[in-house]
Amino acid sequence: MIRIGIAGLGAAGRAFVPAIRINAAFDLRAIADPSPEIRAEFAGTAAVHPHLEAMLGDRALDAVCIATPTEMHAAQACAAFAAGKHVVLEKPMATSIADAQRIIEASERAGKVLLVGHSHSYDAPIARMRALVEEGTLGAPRMANTWCFTDWVYRPRRPEELDVAKGGGVTFRQGAHQLDILRLLCGGRAASVRAKTFDFDPSRSTVGAHVVFVDFAGGAAGTAVYSGYGHLPFGELTFGIGEWGFPQPAPVQSSAKAPASVEEERRAKAQRAKNAIPAKAPHPPFFGMTILSCERGDVRQTPEGLAVHTREGVSTIRVSAERSPRDLLFDELRDAIEGVRPPIHDGRWALATLELCIGALESSRIGREIALVHQCAPVRRVVL
């Protein structure tokens, strides 16, 4: 039994809870959060602490999930490794390459597992696409394109979530999903990135949209398009299915609205976090629409899984919605801790994705292509 704790019980941290509780390999032993209300909510089912440092004093704890603000990740992950814990670190991994490297070095010194996620590259349809690439029946991947349109900018946010210097804005927080997907499908080793980012609303200033072009070392190319301004409804590209696999009601009007006060927004975010990421769904998750083009066919997501288009016609692959992406994350963590197989989403994989996010922002700032130096391929094949 792997005894695990969670630091930070916002939407991301809460989404870990059901995935841990249904996995027989794990025991949710503790949580850490500065909110007295959240600690009271979990009291009786787990030990509660006001902060990660207090939780790390539990010598029986084997691992921690860190879902705190991004600017805290480096110090907290290093402290967890120093305390002898395995670490699951929410994306984005850090706010700088230097901090990400510090985290990796700390994990290697401690000899402990570092897993970075959840990322939508864990999604079962994306993993199945990668398996098609590995099987080789469609030939080499040549293009991967992913598009996502949401109201991300206008959802309740902490101030740092909109501050790019602190890992905020859609390129860090949502591009980390998209670029992870592109890397997994195209072999991981991006050579360069060219991007344009946008701030459409000065009253809610942040990087709220982007177009990113990635050139891969193996000859493939990928694009990521994201807008968080609540114009085009999410479900228009996803057969009416939302990010987590539930039917997405068509909005009667734009969700864009003026932000509330900081305190009101914090309260709204805390309330939304309780149900923002459901555990089970009738369909596989959709992070927008992703289409993979190989030499002998194109693959796209469908409500049931994948459609494979070739010269011979269209075939379908059913993908189970039984297990959530976070269920799959904890399988990967369990296997890594128990020595069954190394994790794909380890520190060096996450560093490469972070480099792409930072490179996209820098490319937009200076108006030219950015060469990449920290890229890597997946360490193994996907497990379906």
Each language-model region and where it sits:
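Beta-loop-alpha module in the N-terminal Rossmann-like domain of NAD(P)-dependent dehydrogenases
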Residues: 16, 46-106, 384
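NAD(P)-dinucleotide binding in Rossmann-like oxidoreductases
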Residues: 202-207, 217-329
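Short, Asp-centered acidic motifs that coordinate Mg2+ and/or phosphate
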Residues: 30, 63, 143
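Aromatic/hydrophobic pocket-lining residues that form π-stacking "cages" and hydrophobic walls in ligand
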Residues: 39, 76, 103, 129, ...
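C-terminal helix-rich "cap/oligomerization" subdomain common to oxidoreductases
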Residues: 63-65, 267, 272-276, 281-283, ...
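Predominantly a Rossmann-like dinucleotide-binding segment in NAD(P)-dependent oxidoreductases
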Residues: 113, 120-224, 229-245, 367
